[in-house]
Amino acid sequence: MIRFSPWSFAALVIGAALTHAALATGDPNAGKIKFATCTGCHAIPGYTNAYPTYHVPRLGGQHPDYVAAALKDYQAGGRQHPTMHANAFPLGEQDIQDIAAYVASFKPAASPQPIRGDAAAGKIKSATCVACHGSDGKSQIPIYPRLAGQYEDYLRKALTDYQSGARQNPIMKSLTAPLSTQDIADLSAWFASQPGGLVTVQPD
């Protein structure tokens, strides 16, 4: 199992705090209007990507800093997804912060979903994940995503992409490198099965 030293984690947490302090303030009311383009995928419960087939991620209750960073990654091409790149590309800094503030304004409350992997095994295997993502997937560090209640197949896709390098992140690349297909399934099941997690954004 790969582990980081306490100093490594301290550096990550300090970096997260500095990043958080540097971000502009988002307006959730403005973000609600700007999110309109996103509703066709992210506001439909159970909606799936065309190919490969996996659920479009739940965003309600996610950390705004993480959402903003993800949108910037799509803008720059660091995360490869043609539709997301096209939608994120024209956004300005304030647009990104407003959208992030809007999705973060939803209270995490999702019920556990039916799962395919072994959640009990995933809990044991998640020991390396907890420093950033929390023991139950409810990360308290703004730049690291909450995972509780996220779609299981989306989590499997994300971990597989980190492992293959299709999704770029040096830390996640190193942590996923030794994982088997079963490990990925079990970890995904554990985080997806946690109550009080992410929800589908539902504009009123």
Describe the residue ranges of each PLM region.
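C-terminal capping alpha-helices of c-type cytochrome domains
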Residues: 89-111, 162, 177-204
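Bacterial N-terminal signal peptides that target proteins for export
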Residues: 1-11
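Gly/Gly-Pro-rich "capping" loops immediately C-terminal to redox-active cysteine motifs
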Residues: 28, 32, 45-75, 85-90, ...
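Interaction-mediating elements
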Residues: 68, 73, 81, 98-101, ...
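N-terminal signal peptide c-region/cleavage motif recognized by signal peptidases
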Residues: 19-21
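Sequence/structural segment immediately N-terminal to covalent heme-attachment motifs in c-type
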Residues: 25-48, 114-138, 150-151, 204
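Inter-heme linker and motif-flanking segments adjacent to c-type heme-binding CXXCH motifs
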Residues: 45-51, 77-82, 105-117, 135-145, ...
